[in-house]
Curated annotation (Swiss-Prot):
GO cellular component, one term: membrane
Topology versus the membrane: Multi-pass membrane protein
Post-translational modification: The mature protein may arise from proteolytic cleavage of an in-frame translation of COX1 exons 1 and 2 plus intron 2, containing the aI2 open reading frame.
Natural source organism: Debaryomyces hansenii (strain ATCC 36239 / CBS 767 / BCRC 21394 / JCM 1990 / NBRC 0083 / IGC 2968) (Yeast)
UniProt keyword terms in alphabetical order: Endonuclease, Hydrolase, Intron homing, Membrane, Mitochondrion, Nuclease, Transmembrane, Transmembrane helix
Keyword Cell inner membrane: no
Main subcellular location of this protein, as a coarse class: mitochondrion
Name by which UniProt lists this protein: Probable intron-encoded endonuclease aI2
Length: 657
């Protein structure tokens, strides 16, 4: 008799054990590929800068999508159902094999072509960087025009076909292939898990396949199922996908739980029945919950439109409908009204400020999937504008305030770069920027680092810290932020060179006004602020806290620069004087000593706050002039309390914040 070859033994087999082991090997191969993608993503995210993809965000998204699809459709489902189910289910049923042995072989051979399509999807052109849910319009032809997304969808079709064939085989095996005397109630819980999983696969996978088919038609046949301009609705795909997606995580986790419980409670029949009932109800609810939520939302939107005639317009956006739904729900919920009363303090500026800041910080959060982000501000949840009567905390003004804060930060950053920063180009044509500040201003650099990336390092031999940014993505973001806000003559030359290398146009420098934060950033970098006593031997003089004979104190604010044209706008806007200092190769100093000019500058800083410790001294200026008018710096028996106040002021002034 001719011996069976290795290929025939494993690839042509209809034995449930052989096919189960083949499923297991295929799943391990897919798992290794998915693990490789996971390692790439973890290497990229191991540091704030780009470590592996060199700023290529599309490549990262492709790895994320490929990793998720491989792990779900090519590892978890084939191993749990194909490998363990095929191997153990017939033995637990007392059956010789599966009900349809050749169908079992066909269901496996749908997977290798699907894996080839999945790998080609990752490697071809720009890849499918849509996330594992492939939501439109990100997966539509306008966003991903190549064949990568089509190949990913073909892979999902083939895996769905494999799962459907396997599900039919499992269900028939459980129903018809049990040994004599083995009733459904007496089956092991593992068999129940396989049976219910197969049943739900049979119900949910056609819905997912239909959703993917409609998306393929939109991409290749110019239909408009998910195109808003053609009368379609992209949210329909979300509902169809999660009819399947809401089910599978719960199902596979339950397999582990109930299989473990099976061995502990095998002899307790009533507990077995309870677990079976719980298992069936849990899986049924997991399959129905998305449909019930969608139905509830549609009913609420319909009711809102009937109550509000202006909402019947056809161009009402989903965001507007979402706001209408949330406002109606908040009006009907007494508990929500009771909770929102805690935030209704229109006269309390501190509470209003806290609400303003928190609403900007926690304005949005993830809903459901890795790609769907839903904006649900605090105003929509529990603080409508008609309840508080305060227009300063409505959603529109929050957005305007956010844009204003962003522009102010960019102007301040440009001023800081003009003062203490520099741009450079390496021999390999890589761009970078550096910035050096005092050691006590480390928090300032942390703000910049959190926004743009980069690294910080202490300077040896100096009480200063240096910030360095060298990755391309961070440099592009920095250039976009400060372009058009730079004013320093030398920095503008460097900016032109860097922007030329990055293929970015250079905008004209902005005009310096009191509503512009550039001077604040420049003062944080190159400005000084101190007061001194003019020594005198006059008998009417007094003693400072340091015991020196002195005249009245003099407060001075100054900014230095090498170029006269850079400091002239300071004098035109805020007054003061400019003189040339020959020390240190010569530089121009803009300084002010008069009370009027200094308080004018303090008002400017309050309007455009400093982000360094210099702000602490700036806020002490009014106290300085109050104590100076009272001559608190004079040491005599008549003003001991005032002199103590002056000493306390000096301690605050010299404190290292």
């Amino acid at each position: 008799m001719k011996q069976m070859s290795y290929v025939t033994r494993w690839l042509y087999s209809t034995s449930h054990k052989d096919i189960g082991m083949t499923y297991l090997g295929f799943g391990m191969l897919s798992a290794m590929m998915g693990t490789g993608m996971s390692v790439m993503m973890r290497m990229e995210l191991s540091n704030g800068n780009s470590q592996f993809f060199h700023g290529n965000n599309q490549a990262f998204n492709v790895m994320m999508s490929g990793h998720a699809l491989l792990m779900m459709f090519f590892f978890i489902m084939p191993v749990w159902m194909g490998a363990f189910g095929n191997f153990f289910l017939p033995m637990l049923m007392g059956a010789a094999d599966m009900a349809f042995a050749r169908l079992n072989n066909i269901s496996f051979w749908c997977l290798p072509p699907a894996l080839v399509c999945m790998v080609c999807s990752v490697l071809m052109e720009q890849g499918a960087g849509t996330g594992f849910t492939t939501y439109p319009p990100l997966s539509s032809m306008s966003a991903h025009s190549g064949p990568s997304v089509d190949l990913a969808m073909f892979a999902m079709h083939l895996t769905s076909m494999s799962s459907l064939l396997g599900a039919m085989n499992f269900m028939v095996t459980v129903l018809n292939m049990r040994t004599m005397g083995l009733h459904m109630v007496n089956m092991p819980l593992f068999a129940w898990a396989m049976f219910l999983t197969a049943m739900l696969l049979l119900l949910s996978l056609p819905v997912l396949t239909a959703a993917v088919t409609l998306l393929l038609m939109d991409r290749n046949f110019n239909t408009g199922f998910y195109e808003v301009g053609a009368g379609g609705d992209p949210v329909t795909y979300e509902h169809l996908f999660w009819f399947f997606g809401q089910w599978w995580p719960t199902n596979y986790v339950n397999n582990l739980e109930y299989c473990a419980m099976c061995w502990e409670t095998y002899n307790k029949m009533y507990f077995i029945m309870l677990l079976i009932t719980m298992y069936m109800s849990t899986n049924l609810l997991a399959n129905m919950v998305k449909m019930l939520m969608t139905n509830r939302s549609n009913q609420q939107v319909t009711k809102n439109r009937m109550n509000k005639p202006h909402a019947l317009r056809g161009d009402t956006s989903p965001k507007v409908r979402h706001k209408m739904f949330m406002n109606t729900m908040s009006k009907k919920s007494h508990a929500l009204r009771r909770d929102t009363s805690l935030f209704s303090f229109p006269k309390n500026d501190k509470v209003r400020h806290m609400y303003d800041m928190n609403s900007k910080r926690y304005k949005s959060y993830l809903m459901g999937t890795s790609e769907t982000t839903s904006t649900k501000s605090l105003k929509e949840m529990n603080m409508p504008s008609q309840r508080t009567g305060n227009p300063a905390i409505t959603g529109t003004n929050l957005k305007e305030n956010k844009n204003t804060m962003e522009n102010s930060f960019n102007q301040w950053l440009a001023g800081l770069m003009d003062g203490d920063g520099c741009f450079g180009i390496t021999q390999n044509k890589y761009t970078n920027c550096e910035m050096t500040v005092a050691l006590e201003d480390e928090k300032t650099l942390r703000i910049i680092q959190n926004k743009f990336g980069g690294s910080m390092k202490l300077r040896s031999g100096a009480k200063a810290i240096r910030y360095r940014l060298h990755n391309q993505k961070g440099m592009i973001n920095t250039m976009n932020a400060i372009n058009g806000n730079m004013r320093h003559s030398k920095r503008l030359v460097q900016l032109h060179k860097v922007c030329s290398l990055l293929n970015m146009p250079v905008l004209e420098p902005m005009i310096l006004t009191k509503n512009n934060s550039w001077l604040t950033g420049f003062f944080d970098a190159d400005g000084t602020m101190n007061f001194s006593f003019k020594s005198s031997c006059h008998s009417a003089g007094g003693y400072t806290s340091k015991g020196k004979v002195s005249n009245h104190p003099q407060l001075t604010i100054s900014v230095t620069n090498k170029y006269l044209q850079d400091v002239l706008p300071f004098k035109e806007m805020l007054g003061g004087n400019i003189y040339f200092d020959k020390s240190q190769n010569g530089y121009y100093k803009w300084s002010m000593q008069s009370k009027k000019d200094i308080l004018n500058f303090v008002d400017y800083i309050k309007l455009n706050p400093s982000k360094t410790v210099k702000l602490n001294r700036m806020l002490l200026c009014n106290l300085y002039y109050d104590l100076k008018d009272l001559k608190s710096y004079m040491l005599n028996d008549n003003n001991m309390l005032q002199n103590k106040a002056w000493i306390k002021f000096e301690n605050k002034w010299n404190k290292k914040f």
